[in-house]
Amino acid sequence: MATCWPEPIVSVQSLSQTGVPTVPNRYVKPAHQRPVFNTTQSDAGIEIPVLDMNDVWGKPEGLRLVRSACEEWGFFQMVNHGVTHSLMERVRGAWREFFELPLEEKRKYANSPDTYEGYGSRLGVVKDAKLDWSDYFFLNYLPSSIRNPSKWPSQPPKIRELIEKYGEEVRKLCERLTETLSESLGLKPNKLMQALGGGDKVGASLRTNFYPKCPQPQLTLGLSSHSDPGGITILLPDEKVAGLQVRRGDGWVTIKSVPNALIVNIGDQLQILSNGIYKSVEHQVIVNSGMERVSLAFFYNPRSDIPVGPIEELVTANRPALYKPIRFDEYRSLIRQKGPCGKNQVDSLLLTR
């Protein structure tokens, strides 16, 4: 894996703050990749499902709702999820404060492509690639043995404490959600967790995304189209500014976040484990000229050093294994080299292409 970026890193936030009237060429996407701000689906009021987890946990009908959302969309919003609302607001606010710090303070945590940990502004190491209009901060969270304390920001005050508290609440949510997803697939509650490597062996990471104002939002993206490489993603969205779009057929649906909701999406590893019953779905982020956005993505992933393939009970004569097994660390390394690229990586594992 590369240990340095192919070109000098430029903070997109700093670039935006200079008041540039146009988007520099390195951020201008090819015409077919540029954002769509109004789609037929959005105009028709089509939105991803919203699940009240009080109606889901431990209830047969709840399992059917989860399965329907995962099969039809690969995305859903959840309310009454158990994560403290005030904690959600405080950790989001702390990260917003971090990104308002002077650039020299943020650069103390500058990242490199070997681990991605820390403060950065690009994904992938392909030279001369078209870049996204965003900055981010990436942290390893689980297992705790791989955390790098030197990469955890010390400013603003209490941000480390908030990261720890938020991470712990979302970890518990992921464990419960993994049981529910397992049952929704017709498996024993603990089967999916076992396939991920076991509760104390799973991986997790946190990426905070910062999307600055953009002078020409129609020419670029905050995050290019991709599916998430891991197991499950729990997103704490910016409630004030929309931007996340989910692919629906040939178009895109802009998610309208519900107050105090978290957004769940299926990752590539769960698509593989479910033998294609549940599918990771392409999504992207659009930017705007008037407001900045902050969101927090918590990635719940398989243990990195075990092969991940279709769960045995989900392989039948009528539905043979669709994917080649692959270790998550190998899969993630390929993603990190290429950067966001639709669903090309998971599709490359299909046994009958």
Curated annotation (Swiss-Prot):
Jasmonate binds at residues 207, 332, 336. It catalyses: jasmonate + 2-oxoglutarate + O2 = (1R,2R)-12-hydroxyjasmonate + succinate + CO2. One of its GO terms (biological process) is regulation of jasmonic acid mediated signaling pathway. Binds 1 Fe(2+) ion per subunit. Residues 202-302 form the Fe2OG dioxygenase domain. Fe cation binds at residues 226, 228, 283. Keywords: Dioxygenase, Iron, Jasmonic acid signaling pathway, Metal-binding, Oxidoreductase, Plant defense. Disruption phenotype: The quadruple mutant jox1, jox2, jox3 and jox4 exhibit reduced root and shoot growth, delayed flowering, reduced seed production, constitutively elevated jasmonate and jasmonoyl-L-isoleucine levels, and enhanced resistance to the necrotrophic fungal pathogen Botrytis cinerea and the herbivorous caterpillar Mamestra brassicae. GO terms for molecular function: dioxygenase activity; iron ion binding; jasmonic acid hydrolase. Its EC number is 1.14.11.-. One of its GO terms (cellular component) is cytosol. It is an enzyme of class 1 (oxidoreductase). InterPro entries: DIOX_N, IPNS-like_FE2OG_OXY, IPNS-like_sf, Oxoglu/Fe-dep_dioxygenase_dom, Plant_2OG-oxidoreductases. Its cofactor is L-ascorbate; Fe(2+). PANTHER family: OXOGLUTARATE/IRON-DEPENDENT DIOXYGENASE (PTHR47991). 2-oxoglutarate-dependent dioxygenase involved in the oxidation of jasmonate (JA), a stress-induced phytohormone synthesized in response to attack by pathogens and herbivores, which triggers the activation of defense responses via the JA-mediated signaling pathway. Converts JA to 12-hydroxyjasmonate (12OH-JA), an inactive form of JA. Is specific to free JA, and cannot oxidize the bioactive form jasmonoyl-L-isoleucine (JA-Ile) or other JA-amino acid conjugates. Prevents over-accumulation of JA and indirectly its bioactive form JA-Ile under stress response. This is Jasmonate-induced oxygenase 4. The gene is JOX4.
